[in-house]
Amino acid sequence: MSKLSIRDLDLAHKHVFMRVDFNVPLSEDGSEITDDTRIRETLPTIEYALRHKAKLILASHLGRPKGKVNPKYSLRPVVDRLRTLLDHDVTSRVNVAFSPDCVGDVAKELSLQLESGQVLLLENLRFHAEEEANDPEFARKLASLCEIYVNDAFGSAHRAHASTEGITHFVKQSAAGLLMEKELEYLGKALEAPAKPFVAIIGGAKVSDKIKVIDNLLNKVDALLIGGGMAYTFLKSQGQDVGKSLVEADKLDIAKAALDKAKEKGVRFLLPVDHILADKFAADAATQTFEGTGAFPAEWMALDIGPKSIELFTKEIAAADTIVWNGPMGVFEMPAFAKGTTAVAQAVADNVDAVSIIGGGDSVAAVKQAGVADKIKHISTGGGASLEFLEGKKLPGVEALTEK
């Protein structure tokens, strides 16, 4: 990686401002954390900084409070969870303090009170509208708390906000945290120097959400497997009548162009060859399996890939040395239409020799539900950020870091 890493810096007795992603799901009243995965993901970076005697200031956003203070989106519940998680292998309790604001006199005073090996968690950055506006004065105030800036929030790296981009203009050294480094290493290698054969599996409802990813990956992959609702826009563009299945009528030309590009590049572009059809969009719908290129029954819609498609996709996945998967194969949240997604999760996990990278909420949920998450080489923490990276875009939060 060409960017400075936290490992390249001397952190001892210095104020380190670390942008983390603590955008965790909370209970209805905002008092309980219901899933602490995002906190756990960044623990190695936090623990690294504390071992190296940093005075650590943590900053994050949580939810969308729209630039106003809203107790429902307070980061206060994170303090206790963070203390618990940090205590597991540290002999003395880690001191985690909380600042009721992320800028201003109180934040400044609390940061000055920090001793080496202690933590200060700032209140939600998005309680200030200036954060998302990337306001330079607000960024300068954040920077005034520290000597070193570390970004470990890959999930926000595609946003040019004050805490991800603006702040870097006011500190001498800006480095990637360990999680950020891992994300860039895995995703970067997949795009720049993948082990071949390289297979990408792209699912989800809409072609419009993923067409830029598909377009970029067609320059890199050996095979592209398409599932989910978007498959029916591709099939329709080839002239198949897909009944009531989801089709983006205004994207048929784009779908056709992608198929043509695949042919031109010699990329195997695999669409489902059979489908699980439903008579309505509901968990208790009547279902039937349909195969072939003929017209779907008029009032029916495809909500999952069928058994032959699973077989076809599994074979491709088994032969791959690099696998990137983003998006479900069907309406994964309904058990009747989750088979395709679960089968793909299993197939990716079964290929233990491949470098497997998974991004996107449904794909990640599928590998967790199938109990195979530990067999995946890299599960990306950033939905939108990993998509933009796979599109070939430069991420503002990464570009802003200091070059080595």
Swiss-Prot record:
Annotated compartments: Cytoplasm
Signal peptide: none
Keywords attached to this entry: ATP-binding, Cytoplasm, Glycolysis, Kinase, Nucleotide-binding, Transferase
Pathway the protein acts in: Carbohydrate degradation; glycolysis; pyruvate from D-glyceraldehyde 3-phosphate: step 2/5
Primary location: cytoplasm
Recorded catalytic activity of this chain's protein: (2R)-3-phosphoglycerate + ATP = (2R)-3-phospho-glyceroyl phosphate + ADP
UniProt binding sites for ATP: K210, E333, G360, G361, D362, S363
GO molecular function ontology, one term from the record: ADP binding
Recorded family membership: Belongs to the phosphoglycerate kinase family.
Protein name: Phosphoglycerate kinase
Organism from which the protein derives: Acidobacterium capsulatum (strain ATCC 51196 / DSM 11244 / BCRC 80197 / JCM 7670 / NBRC 15755 / NCIMB 13165 / 161)
Gene coding for it: pgk
